[in-house]
Each structure stands twice: as C-alpha cells, then as structure tokens.
Swiss-Prot record:
Family membership noted in the UniProt record: Belongs to the bacterial ribosomal protein bL21 family.
Cellular compartments per GO CC: mitochondrial large ribosomal subunit
Keyword line: Mitochondrion
Annotated region (Disordered), positions in chain: 61-87
Compartments where found: Mitochondrion
Complexes and interactors: Component of the mitochondrial large ribosomal subunit (mt-LSU). Mature N.crassa 74S mitochondrial ribosomes consist of a small (37S) and a large (54S) subunit. The 37S small subunit contains a 16S ribosomal RNA (16S mt-rRNA) and 32 different proteins. The 54S large subunit contains a 23S rRNA (23S mt-rRNA) and 42 different proteins.
Species: Neurospora crassa (strain ATCC 24698 / 74-OR23-1A / CBS 708.71 / DSM 1257 / FGSC 987)
Tagged with keyword Mitochondrion: yes
Composition bias, Low complexity: 61-81
Protein name stated in the entry: Large ribosomal subunit protein bL21m
Main location per the UniProt record: mitochondrion
GO molecular function: structural constituent of ribosome
Length: 217
C-alpha cells in the first residue's frame, strides 16, 4: 500500500478531537473584576472630638425663636368721627337755620342701599327681616341723600353730612306675608312639586326728624 492510502486509513480510525469554528461556540461574556479599596480613616481620640464639639458650640450660639400671634385686622368704622369730617361750608351754615324754621320736613333715607322717602310719623315696611333688632329698639338712620321742606332742599354728595340732621326710627316688629304656593312641573311629566314660602318683614316707624342747630356743630 502506498503511504498516502495508509495515512488516510489511520486518520479514519483515530477519534476527531478538533473543535468546531469559533462562531458556532456559545457566547460567554468576559469576566470583569473590580478591585475596591476601602478608605482607611485614622481614628481620633475622644479628647480631640470633645474639643471640636466645644468649639462648634461656641462658634454658633443657639437660636431662640419667639412665637408671634397674628394681629387681628382693624375693624372698618361704619361712620366717620366728627373730628375727621370736613368742615361745613359757609353757605350751608347760612341756609340751614332757614330750612330748620320751615315746617313739614322730609328726607330720603337709605337703608341697606335702598332709598325711602319719609317724613316724621311714617311707617316703613322693609322688604327683608333686619337681623339683630328687636321690637322697641331705636335706630338712628344717618344715611340721607336729600333733606328738604316746601321751599328749600339740601342735596348730599352722595349723602348729607350726618351732623346736620337727626333721624330716628323705632322697630315696631315683624310681619309675615300670606303663605305662597308655587307649583313646579316639567313638560311631558305628570309629577308636580309644591313649594311653600312665607317671608317676614321688619316694620319701622319714623319718630324723629330734626335739623340740628348750626351753633351746636
């Protein structure tokens, strides 16, 4: 036998120990090793720590906080004091005694923003129930836009100075209206709803309407 034939026969008898190509092998990530070095801190003695704490306390003094109570808002005055009101003009001082001497005074009083033309002895039925009043209380009405008589009229801008007149009313009581029944119904619906209402009104009587004297102002 030739040498080439003998060599091929020997290769067939021996087991194959060769590895497959690299692209057929399973993927294995490369192992990475991280080396961490612990930081070594030199221990300090207890005396050094106490001295450092004492210096920190001396350098930063303790802060003292005081609790402050919130201040209540100042109440808005309903009427201006007489000392803060502007002076009365000379023309008003001259004509005010003439107006006071005439009979039959009338005034337009404003109560809760609504005007009422009244004279002394009139009864006013307010369209609401005034809170905080009881029968027998006397109220001073200091918002008047007009004060006049048959010949003279004093017009305010928008109100007459409250030092020029005095208008007082006494609370007579409260009146209630008859019971109202309102029927509410929707279209294409047989159901009806009855709403009952009965409002109350405060009644006042003007018992004083006087124009003050100029000398007392």
């Amino acid at each position: 036998m030739s040498r080439a034939l003998l060599r091929s026969v020997l290769e067939l008898r021996t087991p194959v120990t060769r590895l497959p190509p690299s692209f057929l092998l399973p993927f294995r990530p490369a192992a990475r090793f991280l080396h961490q070095t612990a930081q070594q801190v030199e221990p300090t003695s207890q005396s050094d720590a106490a001295a450092a704490a004492a210096t920190l306390l001396k350098a930063s003094p303790p802060k003292v906080t005081t609790a402050t109570t919130p201040e209540a808002p100042a109440a808005v005055p309903t009427s201006t004091p007489f000392s803060q009101q502007p002076p009365i003009s000379q023309q008003v001082k001259e004509l005010l005694p003439v107006l006071a001497a005439q009979p039959g005074h009338y005034t337009t009083i404003h109560i809760h923003g609504k005007p009422y033309l009244v004279t002394e002895g009139d009864t006013v039925k307010l369209p609401f129930k005034m809170p905080g009043v009881a029968p027998g209380d006397v109220l001073r009405l200091n918002r008047a836009s007009v004060i006049g008589s048959r010949d003279l009229t004093l017009q305010g801008a928008p109100y007459v100075d409250e030092r020029l007149f005095e208008c007082r009313a006494i609370v007579m009581g409260t009146e209630s209206e008859p019971m109202r029944v309102m029927i509410k119904k929707k279209r294409r619906c047989r159901k009806k709803k009855h709403v009952f209402s009965k409002h109350k009104y405060t009644v006042l009587r003007i018992n004083q309407l006087k124009i003050n004297d100029v000398s007392s102002l």
